[in-house]
Every structure is written in structure tokens, then in C-alpha cells.
């Protein structure tokens, strides 16, 4: 077990989720706090802290890709993504999709504001040391954000962490 990974995962989570973390160590993990595994940081904004002192960063435009390293064997895994969403002008629902190595493993219609933990199961058909997770959808925060311009008002999104259990 990678105790540094487990410690980072433990510190990143809220108090109510820590008991679960001690039971389920992640196979792979990336969070906004350290940007480990991010394929391209150009899609992510500066690191910020929310009211609970948890690190997040803005997602500028989909799709965003994160490379997760771990000891992946054949079998079933659970992917969890924690993200925050805030609506502007467009009425919900918003579509969010997650792909693992080019295969869609989950799709959600998000209808509520706030912080969400999305979960999807997927099968790993071949062993490997890394997977690439791509998050896509009809949400973004443009660089020249203007809440009064109807063409620019879409869903605001920020990224907390992603884990594979």
C-alpha cells in the first residue's frame, strides 16, 4: 500500500468521508492540491480553497484529461470524481461524461448546484500501470468570463479530486 498516496487522499477529503478512506485505499488518485497526473494544466485554473479549506481548481474547457498511475490488473474498478458546479443562465440539466482510455464509463445529467461526487464502474481488460481519464460535458468557464453576455453564460465547474478504487 502506498501510504503517501493514502495520506494525501485522507487529507483531501472531508471529515465525514475519512472512515471510508481507511477501509478503501485508492488504486490511483489525483487532486487539485498537487496536480499529479494532469495531462495538460492549460485546461485548469489556479488552485483555490473552498469554505472547508479543501483545494479545487477551475476547469476552463472540456474535455480535460488526467493520467492516473497505479497497478491496474484485469477486473472491475470504481471511479469517483468530486466536482463543484454552479449554474448561470442556461437551465439544467447539464451533461457530464467520463471516459477511461477512450471508453465512456459514465454519463450524468446534473440538475443541482453544489459539490457532487460522481461514481462509475468500469472493467479494465488489460493490466497496466496507468489509465487516462477524460471528463467532458457542456460546461466550461471561459477565460473572458462575462455573466452579462448570454453567449458566455454556462455552467461553472471546478475540480477537487478523482480516484479509482
Annotate the PLM regions.
Residues 123-137:
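Noncatalytic modules at the cell exterior or secretory-pathway interfaces
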Residues 100, 110, 136-141:
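Predominantly extracellular/lumenal beta-strand repeat domains
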Residues 76-78, 93-95, 130:
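Exposed beta-strand and adjacent loop surfaces of beta-rich binding modules
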Residues 105-127:
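Extracellular carbohydrate recognition and processing domains
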Residues 90-103:
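Short, surface-exposed beta-strand/strand-loop-strand elements in extracellular ectodomains
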Residues 2-76, 84-91, 139-165:
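Glycan-recognition and processing domains
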Residues 78, 91, 110-112:
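Structural signature of nuclease core domains in nucleic-acid processing machines
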Amino acid at each position: 500500500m502506498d501510504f503517501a498516496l493514502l495520506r494525501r487522499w485522507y487529507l483531501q477529503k472531508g471529515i465525514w468521508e475519512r472512515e471510508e478512506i481507511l477501509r478503501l485505499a485508492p488504486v490511483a488518485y489525483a487532486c487539485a492540491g498537487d496536480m499529479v497526473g494532469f495531462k495538460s494544466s492549460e485546461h485548469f485554473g489556479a488552485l483555490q480553497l473552498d469554505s472547508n479549506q479543501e483545494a479545487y481548481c477551475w476547469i476552463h474547457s472540456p474535455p480535460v484529461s488526467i493520467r492516473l498511475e497505479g497497478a491496474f490488473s484485469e477486473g472491475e474498478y470504481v471511479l469517483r470524481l468530486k466536482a463543484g458546479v454552479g449554474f448561470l443562465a442556461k437551465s439544467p440539466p447539464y451533461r457530464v461524461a467520463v471516459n477511461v482510455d477512450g471508453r465512456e464509463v459514465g454519463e450524468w445529467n446534473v440538475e443541482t448546484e453544489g459539490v457532487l461526487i460522481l461514481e462509475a464502474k468500469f472493467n479494465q481488460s488489460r493490466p497496466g500501470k496507468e489509465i487516462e481519464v477524460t471528463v467532458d460535458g457542456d460546461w466550461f468557464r471561459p477565460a473572458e468570463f462575462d455573466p452579462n453576455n448570454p453567449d458566455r453564460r454556462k455552467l461553472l465547474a471546478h475540480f477537487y479530486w478523482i480516484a479509482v478504487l
